[in-house]
Amino acid sequence: MKNKKILLLILGFLVILFLTIFAYFRIYQTLPKFAVSLIPEAEIPGQGKTVLVIVPHEDDEVLGAGGFIEKSIKNGANVMVIFLTNGDGHKFTTQEESRKLYPKPENYIESGYQRQQEAKKALAILGLPENKIIFMGYPDNGLKNLFEENFSEPYLSPYTKQNYCSYSNCYHKEAPYTGENLQNDLEQIIKTYSPDLILTTHPSDTHSDHSYCADFVANAIETNPTQPELYYFIIHFNRFPYPKGLHINRYLTPPGRLISSSDEWLKTSLDSDTLELKKQALEQYQSQFASPMLKSLMEGFLRKNEIFSKAKKR
């Protein structure tokens, strides 16, 4: 009888341990590195194919898809990169650049122009010329508001104190900050360039600009006569990428919570030359490297591969 109780206690402990490990994996961890070999390679677009990379901030394109961009350009594809915002709502970097504890609206706008210049330099390293870049200039940290509350009424940026795009190089000059304008502009861009493939941030990304960027893109695709393929990449998620920091000999694997039997994940393997170019491109974003926390996050994407989740057709 005593042995039976001990056995039951041991079994109970093992069950609890298993469930704890499983829950930890689902919430925080990524797949083990051997799982990378089970993820199929994404086809790299070539001659006659058009790829749009649509992201909320300058640096997201290199973090999530820098290698894919470089390989697609080298393979002959027509690649365009579209930035929804100028990343002008980052207080820490604006404080650093302006040397002011309380930056003024014009300091945030100057920061936005700085992010644009960094993006041009970064993408040039990957082989993308400046005329293949579109800056839409919508409000940083405001995409959720545009999608949910300010679809028709202009949104006032708490950083730049503007409710319209005041940048000289906006895609839609002086466009009021409304979700409707952003949606219409995206639809026009997609219609104009007729992409075969769109890459954008993941709808489950924990940064609201990233998740709502995915929503705006998905809605814009729905109105398009042709339906391009849509790949998502993740930037912000629980303990992703794991581990943080520079680990160029490690692989990037999907977060456990984003894995299900119906998901189709793809990878792009990066050789040493492509990885070096991605590293050089990322280093152009010195405004972001000023923050040790951001630097650690960004360097975590310098791995031997990139990963994408293929969107399901609506």
Language-model features, listed with the residues they occupy:
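N-terminal Sec-pathway targeting helices
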Residues: 1-16
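Short, flexible loop segments at boundaries between secondary-structure elements
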Residues: 224-247
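Short Gly/Thr/Asp-enriched flexible loops that form oxyanion-binding sites at enzyme active sites
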Residues: 209-221
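Proline-aspartate-enriched helix->loop->beta-strand connector
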Residues: 186-205, 210
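Active-site environment of divalent metal-dependent phosphoester hydrolases
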Residues: 60-63, 89-91, 203-210, 240
